[in-house]
Amino acid sequence: MADYGLFIGWGQVTRGREKTALDEFNDGIQYYAGLQEKGDIESFEPVILEQHGGDLLGFVLIRGEREKLARLRIDREFERRTIRAGLVVNSLGVVGALVGQGVSEGLVTYQQQLDELT
């Protein structure tokens, strides 16, 4: 079971690039499905948020093993796609995330460091 994730979030689509952004989104879904099929990631979940007045309009949460996702982040194709997405949406971000058992392990590490410092 996955212990780590990549949170890929984005904001408003760049004006005039709406069609391109939709095409890139659909292509990205196929890309993630291919990564899942190859075993490079465990799963992914695209999410589109309701209008809420904030900057975050959607995200994809990719789940997998920390080492595999670390390799993915420096993969040239992943980098190319991230750069391309950043040209059609605002506020694109890729952030590592603890998920599943990783949350418990992260909290244990946090507690240990807290205990050492207090």
Question: At which residue positions do the language-model features occur?
Answer:
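C-terminal end-helix/capping segment
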Residues: N90-L92
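Short S/T/G/P-rich N-terminal loop/turn motif that feeds into the first structured element of a domain
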Residues: M1-D55, G64-I74, V94-T118
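Mid-chain, well-packed structural core segment of small domains
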Residues: G58-V88
